[in-house]
């Protein structure tokens, strides 16, 4: 397994520190692999295998533990059968109802070090922020940058034969989700894989989690975003455009759908900053996609979009977090 060192450095910095490590990011961006690498790091440091509890809530094997009381009881039971510090690694924790109560109770009741992953930004809002204020650190994971892409591609027999120029062209076209490098390198196969992930993110992390009924409207908004990367616009801009296409909707509905897409880490909003007035502007933001491969699986790759594609790429991979960026107005 290839080590994504820039994230593992952060995880190592907080190992055995009294904070909960919360690894967030879009589905299939590599969070589970990082959790597995964390388990291996603990073993390499001499932690007994019996002292590591690893649960992946996407597996039916652990379906009964999606109830927070059952999960708490199971971890307490395992901890009672071992000696020393317990290391709790929980993958896709948002599948557990009121999971934050479990985490807070474990922190209080056990000598433990806790790591969790989640595919929704709402993990860090509401009750969690109240219960764990000052007691957690977020490590947000993005798809592969180009250096990481090259490392993964080197492990794929078909990709390893390509020049760096060809690799970069593929990076812009197919994006940086790690799973594409596990496939036999064929454009149709890769695009089908990416389209399936897009559908999974939209259905599980956006539509189901936010109880969205007008799925056609949501998809229209996503298509608008994909078609306008690199451009400034607002929720009202989208609303006006869709109304011109015969849709009936409010600006507030568009805004809520954009927030749902952000929460699933499918898109990132970058606000405008008025340099002259030194203030944040509340309209005409830019939205960037977490992974360009998803865009091209849905609307196709178009050479005349290269300016927006490169801007999207630079935004993601030259900043620790798109949330720290702004679009300037002179």
What are these regions (language model features)?
Residues 127-227, 231:
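Interdomain motor-coupling "hinge/lid" segment immediately C-terminal to the ATP-binding subdomain
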Residues 23:
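Hydrophobic anchor at the beta1->P-loop junction of P-loop NTPases
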Residues 193-319, 323:
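Accessory nucleic acid-recognition modules appended to NTPase machines
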Residues 34:
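Hydrophobic positions on the alpha1 helix immediately C-terminal to the Walker A/P-loop
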Residues 3-14:
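Pre-Walker A adenine-sensing motif
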Residues 31:
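Conserved lysine of the Walker
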Residues 55-80:
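Short glycine-rich substrate-engagement loop in P-loop NTPases that contacts/grips substrate
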Residues 322-324, 328-330:
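Positively charged, low-complexity/disordered segments
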């Amino acid at each position: 397994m290839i080590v994504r060192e820039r994230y593992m450095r952060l995880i190592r910095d907080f190992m055995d520190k009294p904070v909960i490590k919360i690894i967030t990011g879009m589905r299939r961006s590599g969070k589970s692999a990082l959790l597995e690498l964390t388990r291996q790091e603990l073993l390499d440091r001499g932690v007994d295998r019996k002292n590591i509890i690893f649960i992946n809530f996407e597996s039916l094997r652990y379906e009964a533990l999606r109830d927070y009381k059952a999960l708490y009881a199971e971890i307490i039971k395992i901890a009672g059968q071992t000696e020393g510090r317990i290391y709790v690694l929980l993958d896709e924790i948002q599948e557990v109802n009121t999971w934050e109560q479990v985490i807070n109770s474990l922190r209080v009741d056990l000598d433990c070090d806790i790591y969790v992953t989640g595919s929704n930004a709402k993990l860090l809002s509401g009750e969690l922020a109240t219960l764990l204020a000052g007691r957690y650190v977020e490590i947000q994971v993005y798809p592969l940058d180009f250096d990481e892409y090259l490392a993964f591609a080197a492990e794929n027999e078909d990709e390893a034969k390509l020049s760096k120029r060809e690799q970069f062209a593929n990076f812009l076209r197919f994006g940086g989700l790690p799973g594409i490098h596990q496939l036999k390198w064929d454009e149709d196969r890769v695009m089908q894989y990416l389209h399936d992930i897009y559908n999974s993110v939209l259905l599980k992390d956006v539509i189901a989690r936010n109880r969205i009924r007008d799925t056609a409207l949501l998809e229209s908004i996503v298509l608008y975003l994909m078609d306008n990367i690199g451009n400034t616009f607002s929720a009202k801009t989208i609303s006006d455009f869709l109304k011109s296409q015969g849709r009936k909707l409010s600006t507030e509905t568009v805004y809520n759908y954009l927030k749902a897409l952000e929460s699933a880490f499918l898109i990132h909003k970058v606000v405008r900053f008025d340099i002259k007035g030194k203030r944040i502007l509340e309209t005409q933001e830019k939205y960037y996609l977490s992974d360009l491969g998803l865009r091209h699986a849905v609307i196709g790759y178009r050479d005349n979009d290269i300016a927006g594609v490169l801007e999207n790429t630079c935004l993601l991979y030259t900043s620790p977090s798109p949330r720290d960026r702004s679009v300037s107005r002179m």
